[in-house]
Design a protein with these regions (language model features):
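Structured alpha-helical segments in the cores of large, soluble enzyme domains
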Residues: 43-48, 81-86, 111-122, 229-246, ...
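Terminal accessory/anchoring regions of large secretory-pathway or extracellular enzymes
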Residues: 1-5, 51, 270-289, 295-884
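Loop/turn elements at helix/coil->beta-strand transitions in domains of secreted/extracellular proteins
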Residues: 4-7, 53-59, 87-92, 125-131, ...
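CE4/NodB-like, metal-dependent polysaccharide N-deacetylase domain
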Residues: 109-144, 151, 238-253
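Active-site-adjacent pocket scaffolds in enzyme catalytic domains
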Residues: 150-254, 258, 278-290, 294-295
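The substrate-binding groove and active-site-proximal loops of carbohydrate-active enzymes
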Residues: 17-39, 62-72, 95-112, 127-140, ...
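N-terminal catalytic cores of secreted or lumenal carbohydrate-active enzymes
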Residues: 1-113, 122, 209, 346-352
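Conserved, mostly hydrophobic/aromatic
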Residues: 13, 118, 149, 255, ...
Length: 884
């Protein structure tokens, strides 16, 4: 126990999920109260009013998405009052992103963006900059978040959920506060003071005074038989003295609130006032308690000279009981995860494109519609901010809320595309002197030819203009468009014929085909081609699928001068030879049966396999037929299973970014649970590499974490779940390295998924899951998405090229198409970069209506510094860069 007096910093707060059991709108307005009693507008109303009654009252506000709505509905008196509380220090904004984002699933770009819009609005509205991170509810914590929070300028961050075994050790060693110094391969020295809450993010047990709490109120009239002030005060003092056994400071921090509390703030402050007045008037108790904010607590402990332990790794995976690993949500609602990731990369690219056009003064549409264009970006950014919430991208909200999340994103995209399409039409006219009435976005990469609609135009013997914007680095890329089978010429804007393939690799829909061709791009540039229907001899070579029979021993494919492929049918084994080395591998699809007996069930949060499949998942999809097509641009292998349909694309371009690997596209049929057994589907890439139980996963797509099976760096692990206890979030890639040859193999993902390497050489990624039971973590329903077929993409890379593939995947070509009256180009523009940026640098440019810009640069190659002046044009918009 701490010698001397104990000072307790009691923090009033409300944890307000930006969607979970109810939609964001319902949570704000207090609708659908039968599902959950919550109304955030009432919380802010009553807190702002109550704080005016006593200058010692404090409150911390976290989720800017709700505060923004409240502010827009508030009258001037309310606005003035909350500003007064902020200025006096009674209200502190902590975290202050648009939401409290998940940590396992968001991409680092989307984390930064949702924090940026929150920070900017808080700064513009209240003139303050948040200094405290607050992540009390995410289900595990990434090292990248610690690094980013340090770079955001946060002095500390607070959270509640760490593994039960880890917390037991830290409580015994007084290690619940630490300096987190995440290992950064970039060499950047980031560290941040980290506090783990003593009792979740709740009030002390027995001291909850909210509308929905059942604890006794404080009765302070000694003439009453049920007078309890003294007993309750002594109980609270004893509680904090016990807490002091587990921290190094005589200053203690504790939360006072829970989910959607303080809709009646008077109940809280009136009851707690009685306790504080009684305890603080009695120095013999050796405890003083005051309302506080996290910033005040941090200031107090900074006056001391305590030494804190250092943390270098991360806090994954998280478990709260022996068989309760929260690793299912790494994959839950994979379609939602894919939508959010696609939307994030798309909005990032469109925003930068609009910024480059504006700063160059090359768009009359943007000049005339500056305010409207910025509002469209703002709508998209707010929607994306909501989607980063720890029950949104995590896939742990109710189904009706998930549907609303998707609707929110779709509405925002529709607003953005309304303006972006006009800009693209304008650019087409400026670049090639063609006027198009309607432009169509070809962003449905997982759609069919019928979804795209190009063939409906080609069928009328009319040509199609394709507008291609490259938001990324200079290079040659393979373009893939969805069409039906027919003879086509591909004409470049230079007037030359482009060689390509037209391959119908969908045996289930013979009209669903791909036209593939290679095209060279400058960085941040636009290119054009036309698809012209011809009677015969088109430049897009029609290549038919052929079958590899079970009796055929092997099939060899010559991919390029540096790469070849051999497939052994009887073993279903591939041997890929590249300039980065050779790789022998098999592809399989297995499944774990969900645990559904007594005890912890598998559900939206928890992945717990049934006992008989813990280490031996069952085969999910039998590969019945193998097809192939050898085109000019790609060789395609098709693995047709009874529940999966896989297309593997091997590039034949020697300098293509994917040359030292391949792309794999898997269509997963709806999971059948007619037997009422949940199923959790995994992709297994089995290689011959010996990785000695060690593998690597990225951290939010930014850094990399070393993982060792059945091992934790900071405590002696007792493993109760050998499968789920070794699962980790994969946002960008999972890799293994052979201990003898040092060969590296990585699998890159197109959305967040869970992954592991339970057996040497076998990379396992969970790609879909469906359960029949709830896992008792609050959502109150099983993860039962009915009838969903899902297409996912993976990129397998040999060697160290995963950064290049990741960058290309982040900055995908944005494809638009339109009807055109001519089969030729009247003008022949040479592609030129909107801005010359190094190929190791990723550019983010956000334009604002006041003619200001937010510039952010990500340097993927830390061995090279970047020092460049970006000159917009003669209108003088310099943006200076010195980032490395």
């Amino acid at each position: 126990m701490i010698d001397g007096p104990i000072k307790v910093f009691l923090m009033p707060h409300s944890h307000d999920d930006v969607g979970w059991l109810k939609t964001v709108d319902d949570y704000f307005y207090g609708a659908d109260q039968s599902t959950q009693w919550a109304g955030v507008q009432y919380t802010i109303d009553t807190v702002v009013s109550e704080l005016a009654n006593d200058p010692t009252y404090k409150f911390s506000i976290v989720e800017t998405a709700f505060l923004y709505r409240w502010w827009n509905n508030a009258n001037q008196t309310q606005r003035d009052l909350i500003k007064r509380h902020v200025k006096s220090g009674q209200i502190e904004f902590i975290n202050a992103g648009w939401c409290m984002s998940d940590e396992a699933n968001p991409y680092y770009e989307d984390i930064i963006d949702q924090m940026t819009i929150g920070f900017r609005w808080i700064k513009d509205t209240f003139g303050v900059v948040p200094t405290i991170g607050w992540h009390i509810d995410p289900f595990g914590h990434q090292a990248t978040n610690a690094a980013l929070f340090s770079q955001f300028g946060f002095n500390a961050w607070f959270f509640a959920r760490i593994d039960q075994q880890d917390k037991s050790v830290r409580m015994a060693n007084k290690g619940l506060e630490m300096i987190w110094h995440p290992t950064q391969y970039s060499g950047i020295d980031n560290y941040i003071f980290t506090h783990v809450n003593y009792y979740h993010y709740s009030p002390p047990p027995g001291f909850c005074f909210d509308n929905n709490c059942r604890d006794e109120p404080i009765r302070d009239d000694p003439t009453l038989d049920n007078y309890n002030l003294v007993a309750k005060s002594e109980k609270l003092v004893e509680y904090f003295k016990n807490q002091s056994l587990h921290y190094r400071s005589s200053n203690l921090f504790h939360t006072l609130g829970e989910d959607f509390h303080y809709a009646n703030a008077r109940m809280w402050y009136k009851n707690v006032d009685k306790l504080l007045n009684y305890i603080n008037a009695r120095p013999e108790l050796n405890v003083t308690i005051n309302y506080a904010t996290p910033g005040e607590y941090l200031k107090a402990i900074n006056q001391e000279s305590n030494v804190y332990p250092t943390k270098y790794d991360d806090f994954f995976p998280y478990s709260d009981c022996d068989h309760c690993y929260w690793t299912g949500y790494f994959t839950s609602r994979t379609s939602l995860k894919g939508f959010i990731r696609d939307m994030g990369r798309y909005v990032t690219s469109v925003r930068t494109h609009l910024g480059l056009l504006k700063v160059a003064g090359s768009s009359d549409y943007i000049k005339a519609n500056t305010k409207e264009t910025e509002e469209a970006l703002w709508e998209a950014e707010m929607a994306l901010g909501i989607l980063q919430h720890h029950d949104a991208v995590a896939g742990t909200a109710k189904q009706k809320v998930t549907n609303n999340y998707i609707l929110t994103g779709c509405k925002a995209l529709a607003i953005l595309n309304k303006h972006y399409n006009e800009v693209r039409k304008e650019q087409i006219k400026n670049d090639i002197s063609e006027t198009v009435a309607t432009i169509n976005l070809g962003t449905i990469w997982n759609g069919t030819a019928a979804d795209w609609g190009i063939s409906a135009v080609l069928a009328t013997n009319k040509s199609v203009l394709v507008n291609l914007y490259n938001p990324g680095p200079k290079g040659t890329y393979t373009i893939r468009l969805k069409v039906e089978e027919q003879e086509l010429n591909i004409i470049s804007s230079a007037g030359t014929t482009v060689a390509g393939d037209l391959i119908c690799s969908n045996t289930q829909d013979t009209k669903d085909c791909d036209v593939l061709f290679n095209l060279a791009f400058e960085e941040t540039s636009t290119s054009y081609v036309k698809l012209v229907p011809v009677k015969s001899g088109g430049s897009a070579k029609i290549t038919k699928l052929k079958s590899i029979t079970i009796t055929e021993s092997t099939r060899d494919f010559n991919l390029s001068s540096t790469a070849s492929l051999k497939y052994t049918r009887s073993l279903q084994k591939f041997d890929l030879t590249t300039s980065n080395g050779n790789l022998s591998f098999t592809v399989g699809y297995n499944y774990y049966e969900s645990y559904q007996s007594d005890g912890q069930k598998s559900g939206a949060y928890i992945f717990r396999p049934a006992n008989d499949t813990i280490l031996t998942p069952k085969k999910y999809s039998d590969i019945k037929t193998v097809h192939y097509a050898e085109g000019e641009v790609n060789t395609i292998i098709v693995l047709e299973g009874d529940k999966t349909y896989t297309r593997m694309y091997f590039s034949k371009l020697a300098k293509y970014v994917d040359q030292n690997g391949f792309e794999m596209e898997t269509l997963i049929s709806p999971i059948n649970i007619s037997d009422r057994i949940g199923k959790e589907i995994v992709l297994n890439l089995a290689t011959t590499l010996q990785n000695n139980k060690t593998f690597y996963t990225d951290s939010n797509g930014l850094e990399e974490q070393k993982r060792v099976v059945d091992y934790r760096p900071t405590w002696p692990l007792v493993q109760f779940e050998p499968a789920s206890g070794n699962y980790y979030p994969v946002n960008s890639h999972i890799s293994i390295i052979d201990v003898n040859t040092k060969q590296r193999v990585s699998v890159l993902v197109d959305r967040s998924q869970g992954g592991t390497v339970l057996r040497d050489g076998s990379l396992e990624i969970m790609i879909q899951r469906r359960t029949t039971m709830d896992d008792s973590r609050g959502v109150g329903e099983p993860l039962d998405e009915n009838g969903i077929s899902q297409k996912v993409r993976h990129f397998v890379v040999i060697g160290d090229g995963n950064r290049a593939v990741q960058k290309a995947n982040d900055q995908r070509i944005i494809t638009c198409w339109a009807n055109t009256a001519s089969a030729t180009f009247a003008k022949h523009p040479a592609p030129k970069p909107a801005l010359p940026v190094q190929d190791t640098v990723k550019l983010y440019l956000r334009p604002f209506a006041d003619d200001s810009y937010l510039l952010r640069l990500m340097n993927f190659d830390t061995s090279k510094s970047v020092n460049r002046q970006l000159i917009a044009d003669y209108r003088q918009h310099p943006c200076w860069l010195d980032h490395h």
